[in-house]
Amino acid sequence: MWDQGGQPWQQWPLNQQQWMQSFQHQQDPSQIDWAALAQAWIAQREASGQQSIVEQPPGMMPNGQDMSAMESGPNNHGNFQGDSNFNRMWQPEWGMHQQPPHPPPEQPWMPPAPGPMDIVPPSEDSNSQDSGEFAPDNRHIFNQNNHNFGGPPDNFAVGPVNQFDYQHGAAFGPPQGGFHPPYWQPGPPGPPAPTQNRRERPPSFRDRQRSPIALPVKQEPPQIDAVKRRTLPAWIREGLEKMEREKQKKLEKERMEQQRSQLSKKEKKATEDAEGGDGPRLPQRSKFDSDEEDEDAENLEAVSSGKVTRSPSPAPQEEHSEPEMTEEEKEYQMMLLTKMLLTEILLDVTDEEIYYVAKDAHRKATKAPAKQLAQSSALASLTGLGGLGGYGSGDSEDERSDRGSESSDTDDEELRHRIRQKQEAFWRKEKEQQLLQDKQIEEEKQQTERVTKEMNEFIHREQNSLSLLEASEADRDAVNDKKRTPNEAPSVLEPKREHKGKEKERGSRSGSSSSGSSSSGSRTSSSSSSVSSSSYSSSSGSSCTSSRSSSPKRRKRPSRSRSPPAKARRSRSRSYSRRVKVDSSRTRGKLRDRRRSNRSSIERERRRNRSPSRDRRRSRSRSRDRRTNRSSRSRSRDRRKIEDPRGNLSGNSHKHKGEAKEQDRKKERSRSVDKDRRKKDKERDRELDKRKEKQKREEKDFKFSSQDDRLKRKRESERTFCRSGSISVKVIRHDSRQDSKKNATKDSKRHSGSDSSGRSSSESPGSSKEKKAKKPKHSRSRSLEKSQRSGKKASRKHKSKSRSR
């Protein structure tokens, strides 16, 4: 039992409880007529008597509000909210999926609020606490003034929830989606409620009777109907609310169907307009957006009207606010939206694509008439007949053909222009590449020309130097020949022949050595050439001085040979002459080496492009030819001697003996020469290997030391030039003295001897050999090259004389 103000809660009679329970169990809640049930319950309640009518408690205000209830409201709210059955009983959808809950057995009657409500602060133009409004969105909050269940059911209007005047609609207006008039009948009047102040009324009360659904206007039911409705049990009120919600859902479905039909009609009109129009069109505004805007405006109006006119049930609140939609309806709306969006996008894209395709087709069709057909002789002959003129205007066809030809001309010109640009770029690249190649080839040619010019200049210089040397040596030989008497000519021929043989051997050796060293690079040859040039300059200088000094000697010779004091001077200067001989022999040995190196360098330059194997073969072939020639000559001489032995023996016995000795000597020489050649060939091979290694080293060091060597060689050549000049003067003087001595001894021998001129000529080789042994080596080196030339002529004369003998 709950208490309120010390008054006990009246229990239902047993027959009422049994009747209600039997009624609930007999019928299905979905098929119950809740209005008839409520009328029956009210009639039974009135028949049971008005025992529950009690006077108001002393703490009532003039407007029917209980002060003690207002004070105890929050406490009761807190206590009641802690109950475990509270949340289960007061769910927002408690009447949708299950039967209304039965009253508890211990607490027989518990009238709930019409819906979860919340007190809203008063409006601006109301100063009293009685003008509270229900917020439409806060539906799940329980009213704090709805828990005072201390009074009887008939006086339940005295509670703080029923503090407003229902007739004037300050907080609860007449139900707009409410019950039909026959469901509620006027009952006995209850206690009159005090009138409400006008300042507590909202100013826009009469203007806010709006709703999106047009319903018949009903008269305001009396206050008794509202009070009776509040006194109904919870399960009957739940049934009534359920019935109202079902009606609202039906109305909403009808409205949605109308909207859908309107949308479909608008879509059809839009598609018809799009098909009728030509060309691309801009995307039209979506119709669904405008409908949503209209719905938003209606919902705002409904919310504003819902704040003013309220019913005790939550059904009218849902009508004024946005209607709650089921999941199926939401899915259906989403499908509609997606369809609309997709169709709009598809239409836009297809319109653009169709426009571009049509444009391309039109452009191609205008290009279709070719020039050949427009200008062909067949068409000209057909048009000349006159029968085709009536089928169409020729001017339009000509214009079309001209347009097509112009467009085709422009396209062809563009293509040609592009092709020309590409060809020009390609040609430019080719020209650049060719220019680069030509430049490279020219540079290579210039380098080769420079190298060849340098080589030619070098060879020319060497040839000039050799010619100068030969001229100087020829002058020396001529001077020496003039010094000698004509009687010494046959004695001189023999040593010249011997010099020839030696020179040939030396030439073959130098050829082989030069062939072995021909594989060396141009750097070594250039270095040797620089050395040779310096030596040539020094030798030329010495030859000039010698030629100058020889002229006064000629004048002094007869006086020296005739006068006896000259002999004393010679004997005195022998020691001095020996010293001079040693020095001159050294200098001449150096000159020989330099000449040999010069000759070898010249041969290397001539044989650069030749391989060493070819040079070796040629040198060997030359040596073989020389051997064969010598052997053939010796055989021919032997045959001649054998053919005429008797004629030669009579009167020329001494000559045969001399020739036999000479042949024996030649054979011995040839044998010794062969042995020497073999040894020298071996030594050359070794030297070649050594030279190759040296050349590799010298090539590395030559780059850095070539310049320094050139400077040093120039300085040495200048020094040697001065020294050789002084030495050559001394040597020439000494030679002239020796020649005078030899001439004197020869004259004495000739006068004393009684032999014939033939013996003297036959014995001349032996005497010449003895003289040759006495001669120093440096005197031979001077007359080697010129003796070859003059010796050839003398040998020919000697051979002719020997044959005639």
Swiss-Prot record:
Comp. bias (Low complexity): 509-550, 754-767
Superkingdom of source: Eukaryota
Signal peptide: none
InterPro entries per UniProt: PNISR
Segments for region (Disordered): 75-331, 382-805
Regions of compositional bias (Gly residues) in chain numbering: 384-393
Entry's localization field: Nucleus speckle
Residues with the Phosphoserine modification: S204, S211, S290, S304, S313, S321, S465, S467, S726
Residues recorded with modification Phosphothreonine: T485
Biased composition (Basic residues): 551-560, 567-579, 587-598, 607-639, 771-781, 789-805
Comp. bias regions, Pro residues: 100-115, 183-194
Cross-link (Glycyl lysine isopeptide (Lys-Gly) (interchain with G-Cter in SUMO2)): K218, K496, K703
Keywords: Coiled coil, Isopeptide bond, Nucleus, Phosphoprotein, Ubl conjugation
Pfam families: PNISR (PF15996)
Biased composition range(s): Polar residues: 75-88
Coiled coil: 237-276, 427-461
Biased composition (Basic and acidic residues): 197-210, 238-258, 421-463, 473-486, 494-508, 659-721, 732-753
Biased composition (Acidic residues): 290-299
Family affiliation: Belongs to the splicing factor SR family.
Description of how the protein assembles with itself and partners: Interacts with PNN.
Listed name of the protein: Arginine/serine-rich protein PNISR
